[in-house]
Amino acid sequence: MGLPSIETVECDILVIGGGMSGCGAAFESKFWGEDLNVVIVDKAVIERSGATGEGLSAINCYMGQRYGWNTPEDFVHYVVNDMMGLAREDLVYDVGRHVDSSVHLLEEWGLPIWKKDNGEYERIGRWQIPIHGESLKPVTAEPARKAVGKENIYERVSITHLLTDANDPNRIAGAIGFGVRENKIWVFKAQAVIMTSGGASNVFRPRSVNEGIGRTWYSVFATGSAYGLMIPIGTEMTQMEHRFVPTRFKDGYGPVGMWFQYFHAHVENALGEDYTVTRDDELKKYEPYGSAIPTPTPLRNHQMFLDIKEGKGPMYMRTDLAMQELAGGDPAKMDKVREEAWEDFLDMTIAQAMTWASQNIAPEETPSEVVLAEPYIMGSHSGEAGAWVSGPEDLAPPEYYWGYNKMTTIRGLFAAGDGVGAAPHKFSSGSFTEGRLAAKSAVRFVKENSTSVQLNASQVNTLAESIWAPMETFDKYKGVSTAPEINPHYITPKQALVRLQKIMDEYAGGTSALYTTNGPTLELSLIHI
């Protein structure tokens, strides 16, 4: 077949990924580096790219300092407790002290935030404010698009590898990828790169299979590229063994946060028991975190897991009791509560609203099943996998700081969002904030390091050939069998995915293994892989 055409783009700063952190990075890069050429590349379209592409019903990271709600110190205390001690206090504080200004910026750009009659933000939890958030991502993307200019946005381009300097393997030099809708390989040469691509869904076999395939809680398009790009060039990572297992509504994967915090619902097992009450003594095994308020997410999930393991399921979110109590017998209030219940999912998890509708569930009358989902790997939600990055100069201890905030151990490579490890609970607003912080550092790095990077032509050609190799293999052997998915010379991407999921599910602590694993089991999984 021969290689497709190769096109090279040169820039000062390359932003990889157009999610919340990517849009924040692109916008902020042009604010501080007005004279710099900033390029953003995304495998989709930035208006709907990233984990929030479908929308959100709440901002889950907001201090509320203007109202005296919380301080960054409060946030650090909460995050460290929720992660049972495993978190970088400097990185968490850095997000906490800046995130409010990011939320106010999003509101200025047009994000509708729920407000009280006096103009104060509504509040549904200590750190959460409700929004009409179906449009969150387009609202965030528009300023980024305008800031860098349409000529500097490369969409439908999938980045496959990072490139290092020809004379220094510890210096970033750009990236290479391919057009997903055109016959072209793209090479980006950059003085600095900001890694803002996604965490990893679909590594473990989802609970939704066969007819439900493609339905996951975290974005189905989060393929772990933040990690798959940084690790091969030697970037130091942290907390990569951390798996986040969320409690979610069954089958539709609807989040439970709004139901716990705004509707004040609770979960019961089939016997009508509340596991947070009946298993309170279990928490004492995990002090000092067992007595932390609120109870850390891993421990709450562990309490539910024990109920399920002992055969006390199904587990039900008592939406009916919560909605009836909020309405207080007033039909008009019930109409409002019902509207808010459905909007919660229509704003961000339409599949859950469809699940209710298809099963004739009226949440004010019928409780809904909840389950522990399959594990996910990410750095922006309640997971903390990602790169080991330099902290802020005024907060980080000497061993955590090497010149530029959010820079990885590869010079010139910065990270934000899912790409940063040991800094969880950022969610959408915090990821956007972290992208902005990384961009500010990247601009300073470019201005202070003027020596131009050099691409290794041999490296580029080798990677271009490896990118194109699957197409060559398919074209060469497609005639060997009459069914393209059954062939002795290759496997399809879908076949590779389901085989990986089977191995991870059964050997690496997935749902079928009750989230358990051990050394010999993991070693066996490597043999199978």
Task: Identify the role of each PLM range.
Residues 60-95:
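Glycine-rich active-site loop/strand segments that organize a redox cofactor
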Residues 448-526:
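Long, amphipathic alpha-helical stalk/connector segments used for oligomerization, subunit docking
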Residues 32-53:
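Glycine-rich FAD pyrophosphate-binding loop
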Residues 14-16, 189-198:
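Short hydrophobic core segments
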Residues 100, 107-173, 241-427, 506-526:
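Mobile, glycine/GP-rich and aromatic-enriched active-site lid/loop segments adjacent to catalytic centers
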Residues 195-254, 428-441:
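Glycine-rich loop(s) and the adjacent beta-strand/alpha-helix scaffold that form part
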Residues 13-39:
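N-terminal Rossmann-like FAD-binding beta1-loop-alpha1 element of flavoenzymes
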Residues 9-11, 183-192:
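Core beta-strand elements of the Rossmann-like FAD/NAD(P) dinucleotide-binding domain
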